[in-house]
Amino acid sequence: MVDVNRFKSMQITLASPSKVRSWSYGEVKKPETINYRTLKPEREGLFDEVIFGPTKDWECACGKYKRIRYKGIVCDRCGVEVTRAKVRRERMGHIELKAPVSHIWYFKGIPSRMGLTLDMSPRALEEVIYFAAYVVIDPKDTPLEPKSLLTEREYREKIQEYGHGSFIAKMGAEAIQDLLKRVDLVTEIAELKEELKTATGQKRIKAVRRLDVLDAFNKSGNKPEWMILNILPVIPPDLRPMVQLDGGRFAASDLNDLYRRVINRNNRLARLLELNAPGIIVQNEKRMLQEAVDALIDNGRRGRPITGPGSRPLKSLSHMLKGKQGRFRQNLLGKRVDFSGRSVIAVGPTLKMYQCGVPREMAIELFKPFVMREIVAREFAGNVKAAKRMVERGDERIWDILEEVIKEHPVLLNRAPTLHRLGIQAFEPVLIDGKALRLHPLVCEAYNADFDGDQMAIHVPLSEEAQAEARLLMLAAEHILNPKDGKPVVTPSQDMVLGNYYLTMEDAGREGEGMIFKDKDEAVMAYRNGYVHLHSRVGIAVDSMPSKPWKDSQRHKIMVTTVGKILFNDIMPEDLPYLQEPNNANLTEGTPDKYFLEPGQNIQEVIDSLPINVPFKKKNLGNIIAETFKRFRTTETSAFLDRLKDLGYYHSTLAGLTVGIADIPVIDNKAEIIEAAHHRVEEINKAFRRGLMTDDDRYVAVTTTWREAKEALEKRLIETQDPKNPIVMMMDSGARGNISNFSQLAGMRGLMAAPNGRIMELPILSNFREGLSVLEMFFSTHGARKGMTDTALKTADSGYLTRRLVDVAQDVIIREDDCGTDRGLLIRAITDGKEVTETLEERLQGRYTRKSVKHPETGEVLIGADQLITEDMARKIVDAGVEEVTIRSVFTCATRHGVCRHCYGINLATGDAVEVGEAVGTIAAQSIGEPGTQLTMRTFHTGGVASNTDITQGLPRIQEIFEARNPKGEAVITEVKGTVIEIEEDASTRTKKVYVQGKTGMGEYVVPFTARMKVEVGDEVNRGAALTEGSIQPKHLLEVRDTLSVETYLLAEVQKVYRSQGVEIGDKHVEVMVRQMLRKVRVMDPGDTDLLPGTLMDIADFTDANKEIVISGGIPATSRPVLMGITKASLETNSFLSAASFQETTRVLTDAAIRGKKDHLLGLKENVIIGKIIPAGTGMVRYRNIEPQAINEVEVIEEAEATEEPAIIKE
């Protein structure tokens, strides 16, 4: 076998007949498979041991030679070589075809490669190949045209007319083979290149296509006649197995049936030829042979598929590769693994951040080999077999061994669907009773897991390297930040939030208010004994907490706080300020001075002068976690998170919040508000009946009235709510529910959507406390049902989007430190009309500058060129009033097959500069795809008001952008730079004309009457500026402006969609994806290069080709950039393995074979397919051969004692 990690590239070409013979170990002559009595393979049949190798290891067919010592001997009785049975997976056979047969991929694919090579239509080819017409191969001296078709009758007439042997015409694949042999590639290519200089239109397109195929044959060394098969390879028998079922029946792969048909027809044809049968019979047999081979290669591609029992189409070779169940996606890109298990998950509130609970029964099965080894090492058993028996019997001693084996051995937990890299994390196992896996509550958000019956899979990393990677890179405690936006992903939720909210509440006049304590312990003791309430404001000596960062003026004083806040601050990292107010100032700058008093001052007066603070909500906890991470990194943060979780659970239990129907308040003036709304609606309807408004206007007015009524109720609800009400506490803290849920419980449910998506005018006036009437209940069911179906559809759509995104960007890896480009991207805040979608500060964080940034007023340099912009620096730049900054960007990076560290900036998941080897493409794809399920599905219908078209939003809009489709509601853009001089309306055609006067000429643009204008007379417009509202078509923009403008536009558009749904995604992720869509150029004029006009190629390859020509003094080629949708971009990638495993497998492979494509295995996917370590992270070539140095431990200890320095183990 080939050593997987030894080869650099993989090439695919057409197989010549001699190549097929060299692979083969013998000819399969009979259609038999195995003998029904002896169940042994038949001689010369499809499973023959002589050809394919023995069925049992080291044993020939007749049994003369058994055992390994006869290795390599060929038995003299039965002719079978004594070797491993495994060779039956590798050895091929062949069938000598008695008539040439065309390969359906090359004849039937689109475009037909055979047709282009011969310049014949696929229709004509089909008539010849399937014996419906003759083709003239050599007209000799007759006036016939070469390659022209003759029917049976015409052929006979011509023979009579010109005499026998006066010209050559044949039918069948044989004729095509003769024609293909006559193709002179070099002259044809030269002729086509000449023709291209003058050709236009359809003719030019056809010439370019032909030239492409002929050039591929010429360069690859494939011969066109190899598209016709004279000899058919037979794949190894173990790849098309035949197995006996209970009851003596056999189940065989469909391929065996298909091969049998070919052999039967081939043998029959041989017999007919021997007998000199009449031409028509032979012809018919040849056609049937052709059809049999077609079915074997791609059943159902031409005509009706051959069916097996129960009229089920048989699975041919092509079907084995295609689709989700094909070889690529089912067995090469994803495999089932051993040492894995799955079970239901339950919550493990007592676990540490890096732990998970694994049931004992599960662990013993997963760690069986490790336990067995240890049993033998401790001599509890003599050999492995005995040890295995011990484990299976459940001997008492195995449990202690198991405890030791799993120490420090991380396991991976995965929850499907794995939408981003946080869907698989590593934990240290803790043995538990029961049968459910225990999961730490804080990692639920990353997994999107809950405990209502979710299941998770567990995997054991076996090798030392795998364990080290799991521990260092995948441990759950390391994954504090979300890779998509750099915000903490492990924020507490539900009970944890509620407990900390309750803990930090303040209340006036509770028992013990104004007491002063010397330290924390005294305060807690007083609280435990009931002298002081958790929410009472009390004093505490500042000096009892010496490690906190107090200001000098605050030391030796007494601070006003609550017992709850003393407990809350006790779990905080030491260097964090004492948190008194839930705001960022307190968190970053320190505790405000107003809470401190001198000893001896009247504390009650100070307390009365202070306002009551609001408690800490979910958002505040998130900010505290982010600040902690920023200051102390992962280890301290994960320890702090565990303390926060424990405190939250403990106090939410103590608080004992319950919910009853009486907790839902009654709004005192609900009846009045609704009465007023009814009155207003009546007036509107009256106005409509009098003809003062249109139906559309009436509809909008009515729905607005009800919306306002609902908002009035909501407002009243917020004004009158009691902060101690349990429901209010849950909602306010962010533990569960929001204002909309609350207003449905206590206010009114409001307007509902009808099945057609239009909002119904009749609102639901009741709330859930009063109860709904039957009609109201019926109205609300539609919305509920739509919600469910939408979610189901959205999940599939979003998953498919993620798959396409991953595919197009999987080979983008950080490949070098600095690409040294001199280009940059000028960025400013992204705005949508007046609203800011993304601020400049957010966009600057974690990027490198391209030029130095100066203060706009003083002119001082705030930050130099090529420096990393930190969070604080970004704030400083924005505060100085800078509006635009030139930064290093993925768009302008010059690295081939990837990005450099400086153009990328920081890795959002760690907060540090990105490392070489990081697979940023995959992370970008996951970051954009994972929130896809949160986007809405609907395209908004505005009820035919105030807008010319329905704007696409949510997921459909994201797909529209990434697939580079023409958008719905397209905006008209200007192609000239200048001034809008006039907008004239033409009532007859219902259009408006916009005239733009530029320096070189005048632009005239026709826009629909209903379109909303973005420009007025006198406005200055740039090329590519939108004249009307709507989405710009990116391909059109690319023609008018440059690549960078299109990239910037697409980036802004994607961000608008996500931000409008409240989803934050780092710019750099979108940049990576958009750059992949624009990485190709189309050659316009080849100049002196040997490029072909009209070919698509990578920008880097195009630049290289031009460099060579310019050096040698020739004319360089010209090209124009091409914008491709992500699906097209994936299929156009340089790696045929990656493209074939994505979509259109047969088309990709056909093309790759003709071109003799080489796959240099640069991306991740190609390497997964052939089983190499992926070239990212620790798998990069630079880390390939690192060997951990073994060190004699004794020496280290002695040296350490001698020098009294800690021992350092060398890498």
Curated annotation (Swiss-Prot):
In terms of InterPro entries, this protein maps to: DNA-dir_RpoC_beta_prime, DNA-dir_RpoC_beta_prime_bact, RNA_pol_asu, RNA_pol_N, RNA_pol_Rpb1_1, RNA_pol_Rpb1_3, RNA_pol_Rpb1_3_sf, RNA_pol_Rpb1_4
GO BP term, pick one: DNA-templated transcription
Catalytic activity, as annotated: RNA(n) + a ribonucleoside 5'-triphosphate = RNA(n+1) + diphosphate
Q: How is the cofactor bound?
A: Binds 1 Mg(2+) ion per subunit.
Entry's Gene Ontology molecular function annotations: DNA binding; DNA-directed RNA polymerase activity; magnesium ion binding; zinc ion binding
Q: Which residues bind Zn(2+) 1?
A: 60, 62, 75, 78
Keywords for this protein: DNA-directed RNA polymerase, Magnesium, Metal-binding, Nucleotidyltransferase, Transcription, Transferase, Zinc
UniProt keyword Protein biosynthesis present: no
| Protein family (similarity comment) | Belongs to the RNA polymerase beta' chain family.
Protein name, entry field: DNA-directed RNA polymerase subunit beta'
